[in-house]
Amino acid sequence: MTLRELLKVITGALLAAPFLQLFRKKEETGYYWQIDPDKCIQCGKCETECVLPRSAVKCVHQYASCGYCLFCSGYYQDKRIEFNTAGENLRCPTDAIVRTYVEDPYFEYKIDEEKCIACGKCVKGCASFGNGSLFLQVRRHLCKDCNECRIAKVCPSGAFTRVPADKPYIFRRPPEVKS
């Protein structure tokens, strides 16, 4: 290899390096705001205090803890008129919980993030009678990562905490299965 060829290879590598960095997976560093589900009291501040027009906080469903109940206390109102899926019988004001029949007597519940407003009503219902498989979390793809999160400043229970970027969510421990 001649000196000229060697210089061409080195120059090509130096010119290509910045473009190759675009395709490299970036390692996340730092900390994010997150809600500790064991401290959250579903006060409603997540819905009203986020700087975004629609809160970055959403209800999440931890399927490993769910009982897939016929009567889900996160889905239905406590004082429902009838046992059906009419709007006045449901807990969620925006119809963000989608109920799907699995097999008798089990149903699966999914959260439609587009409709969820982080009011916490379903979370409160699930915690009052169910397994607590519904809880609120700051969704990383929606959050603008404010230096001083406005929700964290007004959270009455101190549920907002900083978590490492490599573990951006706090999940509840699934109930232990006794054999």
For each of these PLM feature ranges, what is it?
Residues 1-179:
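Non-ligating segments of multi-cofactor redox enzymes
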